[in-house]
Swiss-Prot record:
Gene for this chain: fjx1
Keywords: Glycoprotein, Secreted, Signal
Location in the cell: Secreted
Calcium found in the keyword field: no
Signal peptide feature range: 1-18
Any single GO BP term: cell-cell signaling
Chief location of this protein within or outside the cell: secreted
InterPro entries according to UniProt: FJX1/FJ (IPR024868)
UniProt-recorded name of the protein: Four-jointed box protein 1
Glycosylation site positions: 81, 244, 270
Organism: Xiphophorus maculatus (Southern platyfish)
Domain of life assignment: Eukaryota
Amino acid sequence: MRALSANLFAVLLMCALASVFYVWSALENRLERHKRGSSVPDGGSFHQGPSEDHSAKTFRALLAVPVAQRQNSAGRSKAQNLTNPSAFVGSRDYHVNGDDERSAQREGPVKLGYPVDDGIFWSNWLEDVLPVRFTEGYAEAWRSKARTSPVVKLEPGCGRISNQLATFADGTKACVRYGINADQVQGETLTYYLASLLGITNLPPLVLSQLNGDSAQWVAVRTRINNLQWSDRAVVSLTEWISNLTGVVTPAPLRQESSGLLPALRCFENKTTAELLELMQWSDLIVFDYLTANFDRLVSNLFSLQWDPHVMERDTNNLLKTPHGDLVFIDNEAGLVHGFRVLNMWEKYHHSVLSSVCVFRKRTMQRVAELHRRRDSRQRLLELYRDSEPLSQELGFLSDEHAAVLQDRIDQLYKHIMQCKEKYNQL
């Protein structure tokens, strides 16, 4: 009887803790969405998130998981040339390569021919219409400017309370991420460079900065930093603030009532070019979130279906869209480091989402195949990270364990692609 009472008490305690996490997550999420939709002082509207979201956020509770031991790798690797001299610096607006030339094509009807080639790859004509969102040259120029530009104002407006919207001296803005723990900043940063390695250009430019109230970059907001109780010398990330973005609802082929994004679907023939281009970007997003084990986007929605059957009908977490329909992947703090640490909790959902897709971008899959064949994802990511980011040593890199997890996920993704190819190659 005493043992039964003890077990009952333990169950009640767990339920109470779960309820607290649920309520706190919902309240914090509503506050984040409210701040993201509020007006900024210059009259513009900050749209780094939908204005309303009734689904529960699971990421907040998971941040209570103890921080895993991280390794700082020593030594410098040979530099890679990632720069491009042409760039537009200092603009608040969203830039793409060749956007004006291709916008009419995106709005027009579908060309003659099936949108899928070789069984499982999006057609070349679709690839040609989809622009590069943030070019290497543009991103490099923005990072160079953001490393030295003085910050003259910090204010709420970038989601989580611990994040701030920074205004530079020239009037441009960036979101400053001060993580609850270093995993968040490290995860977001390494996720950004993994995207570069894969040729996925949907992530806004990112740079690291070290807080120092006496430095030229931070001296003007020293009082604000002290009020925020940010630690001196902490490494924070700055990502370009993009205006005029809207929320994105999960497309019908990827919802629970559908069979998935498969090349055999007849509905492709009835889609406009713009709709097909969005689906193409979704296929990249799903591949990317699988590799990074990011649970705070579509996977979170899938998990929430247990108590919220309409979650897929609302805006997806941390995913926004430009007026031209180009997707922007934001707030990637759950990727790689934290995502790998809690992988056992989420892996069945990651697998379920990946299994729903058998159409891929050929360029992305070529890079995945190369990383699978060479088995050097750790080395190449580290080289790119160190070559591009002067503060890489201070922030650190993936542990050997997590680097092995990344390579394993690349291998599993490649295996999934080959299974899709075997199944649909005759179409």
